[in-house]
Amino acid sequence: CKCPSCNFNDVTENCKCCIFRQP
């Protein structure tokens, strides 16, 4: 995952991985 803070409210392409718990 490339989302620094892994904000679950952030649904941008870079942060979607955080929401789905991917790298």
Swiss-Prot record:
It comes from the Eukaryota. It is found in: Secreted. Expressed by the venom duct. Upon intracranial injection in mice, as25a (the toxin without the two 4-hydroxyprolines) provokes paralysis of the hind limbs and death with a dose of 240 pmol. The keyword Secreted applies. The cysteine framework is XXV (C-C-C-C-CC). The modification Proline amide is found at P23. Keywords: Amidation, Disulfide bond, Hydroxylation, Neurotoxin, Secreted, Toxin. It comes from Conus cancellatus. GO terms for cellular component: extracellular region. GO terms for molecular function: toxin activity. This is Conotoxin as25a. The modification 4-hydroxyproline is found at P4, P23. The keyword Magnesium does not apply.
